[in-house]
């Protein structure tokens, strides 16, 4: 799973060796990520968008991106932002959209205007299992409304969902208290590792529900790294998780020094990657 010994040592809590389906070799080598499944989470470039929204969208298109995952519309209406995406030949294939306390019908109408058919709740955190269960109930209800409108709504993890609360992991509460028909999972692979879990084992634990990957690398110091420059063995991970539904592979870095360089490094690495 890791490309260096230091990376493996840093990930204390991961299983030393993957077993069962995690060891399976899914056929031929040499696959590549189809470009239509390659995207970037625009949160990575949030500081640039605040200074120059159009110029940054154009720069992403020049790198080669054709799909993006939204994280807000930076003061524009859904229609205005859609026109900007169209101008630079970009397509919103997914978005992070909070539902708690929001008018879900309005969120759905905006999604239809912007054109995406996958959305996810970006964050939740609670201290008790009762709160997590109540959240899962609200999530399922909102996701059912999205589903009826033709949009798949999911949950995006951080690390804390993989750490037990009173003996139960919140990620398991979310998965077991929502319907697979309503709620898919968007696994942020950096945070899965940071939470002490094995991404491949977690993928097969919820096989069929994981429909999006946040492709975020982990440096030897445990911090964020540009995709392909850190310790996660992406070729092995993607090869072992190839089975199942078509997935979106979404480049992300939470705090890049040079967001456009990060975007280019991630795009070039994933386009060239063979597994």
What positions do the PLM features span?
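Hydrophobic faces of well-ordered beta-strands that scaffold small-molecule active sites
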Residues: 36-41, 68-70, 92-97, 119-121, ...
